[in-house]
Amino acid sequence: MKIKKLAFFLSILLWWYFPLYAQLGGKQHFSFLHLASNARILGLGGVNLTADAKDLGMFWANPSLVDTAHATNLQLNFFTLNVGSTYSTLAFQKNLSTTRFLRLGVQYLGYGSFDGFDPAGSSTGSFSAGDYALTISYAHRIAPFTLGTNLKLVGSSIANFSSFGMLLDIAGAFIHPEKDFKVALAIKNVGFALSNYTDLSQFSMPFDAQIGFSYRPEQMPMRFSLTAHQLFPVADIVYNDPNRKGVIDALGNEVKQSVSLFDNISRRVVIGTELLFSQNFNIRLGYNFLRRSELSAEMRRALVGLSFGFMLRVKNIEIAYSRSIQHLSGGINCFAVSLNTHSLAGKKKKVVE
């Protein structure tokens, strides 16, 4: 009965929210929440719900993805973006019991410093801009199912202007008790703005609905994952550039090329692969169809949309690096360090004794 009530509540919630978020990119507030939150996600294509549950930083993508035997409980990710912007995330986990988990996360995206001018062209000095979020995450596991939620206080500032919002993620996952197989569904960034930059500011929240699965075949050192994102609106998500030139037909008329149904569907898909050489070393590969379609040059697509990375664990310290090729002029790099503070504290205690 409780499951039926929850399903009914979610259906009403989604029915109400879908029309509000049926917009293309550029019209959303706090859109930095779409960025990958840790090195693993970045290396697997930027969107993933079902990667290794032992990775603490996965809770930003899927709050229901937990594991009772986390190798680390503290994780720091540092991203280098283009034009001097930097992005950092910090995560911490506390196991309340074998079935209940509490996570805390901080995200900060700094855009750097800018020169300000008034309408007359006179300098007003420099100013900075940034986005940030504080996340409290809770998950409850009733094997083989897990439910999780993220409550996020989000903020954004540009010079003397600021905006705040309250957002919620809801997710559920099925984790096979014996095989390396996971299925997950996540509804992200449902919420509202507490305040806007000005009274005239009108933005929608960065809503997203995602579903994904991952599977590692037995006796095969590879884990495959597929994630579908931006499932709503169901309509065309393609941005039709009005400046894009069409094809000239036999009569000399310009005909705009339309995007096929297959292309519209494939842009919602992200695929990833992990090469699992051992528990202490793996390589990650990913492909993002939407990124390749939207950000690559029409005459030279190169490797846009691809991503890769690796993880190396030495005792209680885990180091990871990933790179995502965003466009021809560059990409995003992520350096991550994860620690098991309990083990480190235990070692220090033994030394003192």
Task: Please provide the spans of the model-predicted regions.
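N-terminal secretory signal peptides that target proteins for export/translocation
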Residues: M1-I3
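Sec-dependent N-terminal signal peptides
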Residues: K5-W16
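Sec/Tat signal peptide C-region and signal peptidase I cleavage site
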Residues: Y17-A22
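Subset of outer-membrane beta-barrel
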Residues: Q23-E353
